[in-house]
Amino acid sequence: MQPTHSVNCEPLKSLVRTVPDFPKPGILFYDITTLLKDRQGFAKLIDALAEHYIGKNIDLVLGIEARGFIFGPALAYRLNAGFVPVRKPRKLPARTVRVTYDLEYGSDTLEIHEDAIEPGQRIVLVDDLLATGGTMEATVKLVRQLGGEIAGLAFAVELDFLKGRERFPDLDVFSLLHYSE
């Protein structure tokens, strides 16, 4: 599904470096650091994400560790919303709620401060990349556990062939750069 917005993001693909056989043989890695260092490209990316959510009364943007921390604060600023980090275990100083989820080889855990979300707050969850959707699915569980209302899931890049968006049939999944292989 291609995004609908007035910022033409297709040229931004030329700023994304591809690295074959990383992190292991047979994987083509889409490296966004080359996009991030381009001030105009980064600004266009944030503007396009923000355009999708302006007027939707967003209270908070949640960024998932680690690269969600790059996009989250910038998006929150553009939406006049607060920013909340979703962290790996034992990184937050106050009381937290956590969710453990399965990975290809093992499991991982995410945490959020238990007072980070007030019931009914409208929230956008943001990460750099949508692949299989496992990390975002865990974050959705955290938000719902705290009573937040999910206004959308935002990604800079989506690997369409991994079908991660199929995990979220009832949510607004918004990705800017789509790759089919």
From Swiss-Prot:
Presence of keyword Cytoplasm: yes
Localization terms from the record: Cytoplasm
Keywords assigned: Cytoplasm, Glycosyltransferase, Purine salvage, Transferase
Residues spanning the membrane: none
Pathway noted in the entry: Purine metabolism; AMP biosynthesis via salvage pathway; AMP from adenine: step 1/1
CDD domains: PRTases_typeI
InterPro entries assigned to the protein according to its UniProt record, in alphabetical order: Ade_phspho_trans (IPR005764), PRibTrfase_dom (IPR000836), PRTase-like (IPR029057), UPRTase/APRTase (IPR050054)
Pfam families reported in the protein's UniProt record: Pribosyltran
GO BP term (any one): AMP salvage
Name of the protein this chain belongs to: Adenine phosphoribosyltransferase
Underlying gene: apt
